[in-house]
Amino acid sequence: FFLFLSLSVKSQTVSVADFLGDRQAAVSLTFDDGIQEHYTLVAPHLNRYTLRGTFGINGKFMGDIDDHFAPRLTWEECRRMVADGHEICNHSWSHPNLTAIDRRTLLVEIRKNDSIIKAETGVKPTSILYPFNATTPQVRAVCEEGKVGARLEQFGLGQRNSGCTAASIDTWLRQLINDRRWGVTMTHGIYTAWDQWDEPWVLWNFFRELAFKKDSVWVDTFSNIQAYVKERNAVTLT
């Protein structure tokens, strides 16, 4: 990324914009567990509004349409999503609690998943979504090596467990803009899996609202925004 610089001629001051295009806030839409609904339902809505999402997958379960949890994505579906500009990232090989396994097993969980994602999609994962959002400094040191970062804070974007409504999502987004922050959402299933939606139109309307606010809110993949933020924070202006 090229950092966006703001220049005031009168005062002769230069500053680095908080977000690309000098927007007021940023949003990354992340989706966990490689659920097939992410391809059949979520991606078409994102594509309609030219929005890009980040999808965390578990290589062990790919293509399992009879999974008791929810039918899973296939690799061909992942390749199509990548072609549309979406990010496929590491969510571990088999979705264990990474804080409860030994270092050798942890390395297998991350490296095996990285390898198969690269082999199947042609793109090496540059970010990670931690299973159960569980991590420690020791786990992070292993998992984030060679990556731009990991999701460490998230806004649960679902209904059965997170209890989202149109009003609560609107409040979250307004606060994000007011505070000039980057917000990361976390969604699992739509009709299946965990934290399903009783009213999925609320989610689709949120996507539409993000597209409407494209001049003030930068919506992009987790890795793209994380890379910009890291560069921004590393800049020293003299």
Regions found by a protein language model. Name each.
Residues 30, 38, 42, 77, ...:
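Alpha-helical packing segments of well-folded alpha/beta enzyme cores
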Residues 13-21, 53-59, 63-64, 118, ...:
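C-terminal domain-boundary segment and adjacent tail
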Residues 31-34, 92, 189, 222:
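Active-site metal-binding loops of divalent metal-dependent hydrolases
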